[in-house]
Amino acid sequence: LLQQLYANSFGQRPRASLLKALLIHTADDLGNPGPDYKFGWGLINLKAAADIVLAHKANPTAPRIIENAITSTLKTTTTTFTWDGVSPIRATLSWTDPAGAPQTAADSRTPNVVHDLDLKITGPDGATTYLPYVMPFVGTWSAAAMSASATTGKNRVDNTEQVYLSNPNRSGTYTATVSMEGPLTTNSQPY
């Protein structure tokens, strides 16, 4: 349904990474704040995702859905937005990563993302930086380890990242930055 709504609204099908980002971005959080090992990103809220698509259709210049790409000459993109300082800020980045090298080890802890894109939000002061959720390395799998909360930091292992500020406490202009370190294995990496 979401794919059809997007196609009807914009005349083309959304990329898989965009659908994934919309569903994660609008999911109702369950359990620990942010992603966790028990509930993932939460419960899909299709209406909230559809509302974003419709709001973007009504005002495509507002930064609700941003599709861009990292290239060999454009390794960083930025989007600025004005915020009220009261309501939460949530930014979600997702991309379809090229196939990595096959892994032979079961439950490998080695990052296997090919194009490691990074998301961060910089506050109005230009110095305060907010980083995405990262799942803690839990070592031995146990019930206690599986209930660990996500933290924030540089995410080196996932092709989806989310920055969430529950109470920004500061109104003004924020900047969302998507960047990539390392070489591209393709001409571009859309997100």
Task: Give residue ranges: language-model regions.
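Acidic glycine-/aspartate-rich tracts in secreted/extracellular proteins
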Residues: 27-31, 96-98, 125-127, 182-183
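Generic recognition of stable, solvent-exposed alpha-helical segments in well-folded globular domains
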Residues: 14-22, 41-44, 112-114, 158
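Noncatalytic accessory or regulatory domains flanking protease catalytic cores in secreted, cell-surface
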Residues: 35, 118-191
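Secreted peptidase-domain scaffold signal
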Residues: 38-115, 123, 186-191
